[in-house]
Amino acid sequence: MSFSDWINSSYPNPGIDGQWRWLHITVLIFCIGLIVAFALIFRKRSLKTRKIVLWCLVGTILFFEITRRIINLVKMNGGGNFNDYLYTLLPRPWCAIACWSIIIATVFNKKFLYNFASMTALLCALVFFAYPGAGFNNQYILFENLYSISTHSLLLVTSISLITLKFTRFEYKNIWKEGICLAVILAYVFLEIYGLKIESDPMYFMPGNDVMDIFGVGYSTYLAIYIIFVIIYFNVFYLIDDRKNVVARFKHKNNLDNDEESRKSYEIIKNVLNSKLI
C-alpha cells in the first residue's frame, strides 16, 4: 500500500464486523480517559487556559474537515459539475454538521452556540459509538476510516468537555436561542435534501434509513419515536443544569395552586355561614 493509496482511500479495503471489537473499545476508552483528564486538570483553571484546550480540540476537528475536502477536490482533478463541488465542500451528514457547529460556536464564543453544539455533537458521537456504520468496519484504517473515527471521537470529547469546562449553561429562559439554532439546522437539512440534492437523509428522519431498519418499525411509528426522543434528549440538559429554577418554579406553582384551593375553601365556608345567618 502506497501513501497515495492510503490518503485517497483507494486501496482495496474489505469490510469486517468491527463493532465492539478491540479497536472500537480501545478508542472509546481513550476518549473517556481524555474527558476525565480534561475535567480533572482544567475544570478549575482560568478561562484562558480552558479556551486553549478547547481550541486544540476544535483545531484538530478543523484539520480533518479541511484535509478531507482538499483530498476530495484533488481527486476530482477539475472535473465534476457545480453540485459535485457542493457535495465535496459542504457539511452533509449530521456528524459533519455537528463538527462545524462546534467550530462556529468556538469562533463566535456565544453561550447558546456552545449549548447547541455540545448537545448535537454528543448525540452524533453517542450514536456512532453505539452503532458505528463507518470507521471500524474495514480491514485497514485508510484515511477515510481515520477521518470517521477521529472526528466522532473528537465530537465525543469536545461536546462533554464544553460542559465540564463550563462553556455551557442550559437555562429554560434561554432555550429559545438553541431552538432557533435547531430550526436553522433543519432548514439547512431540507435545503440539502430538496434544494441542493446533495444528501438524502442527513439527520436520519427520512423513510428507509438505517436506524429505522434497526428498530424494525413503520415510518410513522419511527418518526413519532424520533420526535419524542429528540424532545426528551434536549430537555435532559436543561432539567439537570437548570434544576434549581425548575424546582423553584414547581414549588411556586404548587404554592399558587394551594393558595387558590385555600381561597376557594374560604369562599365556600363563607357562603355556607352567610346562608345560615340569613
Over which residues does each language-model region extend?
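Juxtamembrane "helix-exit" motif on the non-cytosolic side of transmembrane helices
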Residues: 66-79, 130-140
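Hydrophobic core of alpha-helical transmembrane segments in multi-pass integral membrane proteins
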Residues: 24-43, 58-67, 183-190, 227-239
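Membrane-interface helix-boundary motifs at transmembrane edges
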Residues: 41-55, 107-115, 165-176
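Membrane-proximal helix-loop-helix units in multi-pass membrane proteins
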Residues: 101-163
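Short, highly charged, low-complexity non-transmembrane loops/tails of multi-pass membrane proteins
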Residues: 244-277
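N-terminal topogenic module of multi-pass integral membrane proteins
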Residues: 1-52
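Membrane-interface transmembrane-helix boundary segments in multi-pass integral membrane proteins
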Residues: 12-29, 175-184, 196-238
